[in-house]
Amino acid sequence: MNIREEMEKMEKEILSPFACCSVDSLGRDLPEEEDDIRTIFQRDRDRILHSKAFRRLKHKTQVFIQPEGDHYRTRLTHTLEVSQIARSIAKALRLNEDLTEAIALGHDLGHTPFGHAGERALNKLCSGGFSHVDQSIRIVEILEKNGRGLNLSKEVRDGIQNHRSSGKPKTLEGQAVRFADKIAYLNHDVDDGIRAGLFREEELPAEYRKVLGFTARERLNTLIRSVIFTSRGKDKLSMEPIMEENMQGLRKWMFQNVYTSSKAKEEEWKVDGMLKLLFSFYQEHPLEMAEEYRFLLKKGEEEGTEDPKLLLDRIVADYISGMTDEYCSHKFMEYFVPKAWEKD
């Protein structure tokens, strides 16, 4: 019995009957020889962690576009916070932590530069629309590894595909990530809003503070414990109704006071204009895209299974959505801002 088999045996003995054990995985689309040390979900986690898309998250906006300060969240720090919360829930409920971590690390790979402002811009520009959730799946199935994808397990892909609020993950591990995502972004966005001077802690609605907690630490602890103690011994994860109601109420307050107003919105019109110009430029000059995207475009044209315009739009969206905030700004400056010149 090798190390992987020992771990798989241990999972069967220790994990909850509602957990997804590694040995019970539905596998990958392309079968692979099993590793003698790592389980299937550990390998998935490692593939995501070492992917280029994951590394780019460190320079992608969470809420505030180009904030001045080192302590505002980025898409990467959000992802790590989701992973920590989801693993805490999984450990307490005796779920598969490796599967949970893999889903958490991969759930936001498809996010655009400049956060949801970039996503909204691409959704308007791209034929067929654009969603960061669908793009996350496209990254792991196609775009990574020069068009080969990461060949992740069906369980990890299901968790990534269904992490949005309306999603219904088939595994409890996927459900843990879905709750962790909501808990993480609400709490750290409140924290970043206070740091940005948009409001003070004391200005948060009293009714939500009374139920959820008077500090970021209290709110985080309250919501995580609610998921854990409401879900123990059950085949579906949930939260106490009063906690769910107050979390949604605070989220609505954040939309009214942060997400759709103030500093979080001031620069969005620039993002919209920037991406519109870049999208049109790459439609007209596809050879200016990076080599891997030119390869995918050529491959699609040779296969001839997709409408040429839809294909071009999709590859351009792939390229732009993969950019970091800084790289996107750099490309805009390169193509649309006159350069200084020196006299010979």
Predicted regions and their residues:
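Histidine-centered, transition-metal-coordinating active-site segments
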Residues: M1-T79, S83-I89, N96-E97, F130-D344
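A generic, well-ordered mixed alpha/beta core segment in the N-terminal half of proteins
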Residues: L99, I103-N146
